[in-house]
């Protein structure tokens, strides 16, 4: 196995919370997949959840080499958790196509947050 893509992103939680306060659920819907929205609406710390998802999707798009552009959107990425709570990345649409072209067989996602920031790192392996 070889690393074919690596991306990292950091998001300021307060900035995401302010955008959420200004734009409401429309901002969240722009970032989150339908599955993620189901979780989001039931949370008390929505800004923190959204900041982590934003950072993860930005990191994944950087690992693809495109960023959120060239037909790749936030909706192409869904962050899920396994039975132990470990986050993992599900790709769809243009992101899945590009990952396939890159020979991606395995994805790795690490998420962390502290008081002010959420950070994510994504590794794509062939």
Swiss-Prot record:
Catalytic reaction list: apo-[ACP] + CoA = holo-[ACP] + adenosine 3',5'-bisphosphate + H(+)
Any single biological process term in GO: lysine biosynthetic process via aminoadipic acid
GO molecular function, one term: magnesium ion binding
Keyword annotations of the record: Cytoplasm, Fatty acid biosynthesis, Fatty acid metabolism, Lipid biosynthesis, Lipid metabolism, Magnesium, Metal-binding, Transferase
Principal location listed in the UniProt entry: cytoplasm
EC number(s) on file: 2.7.8.7
Name of a matching Pfam family: ACPS
Superkingdom as given in the UniProt entry: Bacteria
Gene Ontology cellular component list: cytosol
Locations listed in the record: Cytoplasm
InterPro entries reported in the protein's UniProt record: 4-PPantetheinyl_Trfase_dom, 4-PPantetheinyl_Trfase_dom_sf, ACPS, P-Pant_transferase_sf, Ppantetheine-prot_Trfase_dom
Binding positions (Mg(2+)): 9, 58
Database matches in Gene3D superfamilies: 4'-phosphopantetheinyl transferase domain
Top-level EC class as recorded in UniProt: transferase
Necessary cofactors: Mg(2+)
Protein family per UniProt: Belongs to the P-Pant transferase superfamily. AcpS family.
Function: Transfers the 4'-phosphopantetheine moiety from coenzyme A to a Ser of acyl-carrier-protein.
The name this protein goes by in its record: Holo-[acyl-carrier-protein] synthase
Species assigned in the record: Vibrio vulnificus (strain CMCP6)
